């Protein structure tokens, strides 16, 4: 269990082990965080990664047009060579999904995963805006839950 250095432990260190796909299930997520992450991948990976994002609380809190358009713009934009593809989808049927999972895979096989309170938003990963608690979890179980 850990509450410090989440950005490196969850978003960047797994890249050093040759991971090529990050699947994120987040209760809340923003295009700003996705854009920040893509920009900060610069020179941090030897081969391009695929990013899959599912935003879970849409049935409960809805999603603004500007947030949806922000995700659309990122998904359809020219990506840097560090990113092979970005997919973004939303849970639209109830019940809403309040879980937060970050699953790293290599060649389609889940290798490491994290769960906890950190949403995929900048206030969880950038700066010291609030405390978050995350833990490693079983990657196969996390992947099964994600799917």
Question: Can you name each region flagged by the protein language model?
Answer:
Residues 1-147:
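PLD/PLD-like phosphodiesterase catalytic module centered on the HKD motif
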């Amino acid at each position: 269990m850990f509450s410090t250095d989440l950005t490196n432990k969850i978003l960047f260190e797994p890249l050093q082990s040759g991971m090529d796909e990050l699947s994120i299930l987040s209760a809340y997520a923003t295009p700003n965080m996705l854009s920040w992450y893509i920009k900060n991948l610069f020179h941090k990976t030897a081969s391009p990664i695929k990013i899959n994002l599912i935003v879970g609380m849409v049935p409960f809190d809805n999603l603004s047009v500007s947030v949806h358009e922000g995700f659309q713009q990122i998904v359809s934009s020219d990506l840097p060579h560090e990113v092979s593809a970005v997919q973004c989808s939303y849970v639209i049927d109830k019940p809403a999904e309040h879980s937060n999972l970050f699953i790293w895979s290599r060649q389609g096989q889940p290798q490491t995963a994290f769960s906890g309170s950190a949403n995929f938003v900048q206030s969880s990963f950038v700066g010291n805006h609030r405390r978050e608690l995350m833990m490693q979890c079983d990657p196969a179980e996390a992947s099964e839950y994600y799917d």
